[in-house]
A protein has these predicted regions:
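Alpha-helical membrane-targeting segments
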Residues: 10, 103, 189-216
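Residue-level marker of beta-strand positions
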Residues: 17, 132, 162-163
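A short glycine-rich, His/Asp/Glu-containing loop-to-beta-strand
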Residues: 99-131
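Glycine- and acidic-residue-biased ligand/ion/polar-headgroup-sensing regions
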Residues: 128-131, 137-153
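Short acidic-glycine-tyrosine-enriched beta hairpin
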Residues: 153-176
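Ligand-binding loop in jelly-roll beta-barrel domains
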Residues: 170-192
Length: 216
């Protein structure tokens, strides 16, 4: 989907080794196209395989300068959270250019949805220090890109530029001590599985239907 492609593009922008690997893959694709018999159609790119190959590379920390953008396309280049600001990857700055409206959810979680396509629920999530998301599973796939701070769940700890994929086989409870800003994309609603949080499942379903019913 477009939403998941945006998340992957933002990850590549933040990760130096992934940018290099992506460039190598693009170069190979061009060479293959030039060498191929023009009469034979090219196979569709293996997005899942490419995603696995890119995100499996070791991540390096570096600073990059963004190219100047047109004045006709105002971008939300930063998000201000508490006492500091977070610079957004260019592709997310474009996604946020329509404006972000933050809503407080239970447990110190703040959410601002952005409309990218009509197949996925795309949102910025800010977890305040010491907060946690209720235990939940996924009815489909969820990709999460950490933009600032970090969080942990049953599978590990994640920091800036980390790119996670969860699916219906996974159940977890993200939590953070330091606070964390993420960009998340879901292709189906998440389902809380314990305690009073289960009462919010109808709301999750409604939010997903509303997010995917927008017209472009």
């Amino acid at each position: 989907t477009t939403g998941m492609s945006v998340a992957l593009s933002a990850h590549i922008e933040l990760c130096q080794s992934c940018r290099q690997r992506s460039s190598e893959l693009e170069s190979r694709e061009i060479v293959s196209w030039l060498q191929a018999d023009r009469a034979q159609p090219l196979a569709s790119p293996d997005f899942s395989g490419m995603l696995d190959l890119i995100t499996s590379q070791p991540q390096l920390t570096s600073e990059t300068k963004e190219a100047p953008h047109s004045e006709e396309e105002p971008l939300v280049s930063e998000i201000h959270m508490l006492d500091h600001s977070i610079t957004l990857p260019r592709v997310l700055a474009k996604a946020a250019s329509r404006g972000l409206v933050w809503h407080k959810l239970a447990g110190g979680i703040n959410q601002a949805q952005v409309q990218i396509d009509n197949e996925t629920q795309c949102e910025f999530l800010y977890m305040t220090p010491g907060s946690q998301v209720p235990v939940h599973r996924h009815q489909g796939s969820e990709v999460t890109l950490v933009l600032d701070g970090g969080f942990e769940d049953e599978f590990g700890h994640y920091g800036p530029s980390d790119f996670l994929v969860r699916d219906k086989r996974d159940q977890h409870q993200p939590s953070t001590e330091e606070g964390c800003l993420c960009f998340a994309v879901l292709d189906s609603p998440l389902t809380f599985t314990s305690g009073l949080a289960r009462l919010f499942n109808p709301i999750n379903n409604y939010r997903f239907r509303r997010a995917t019913s927008q017209r472009f």
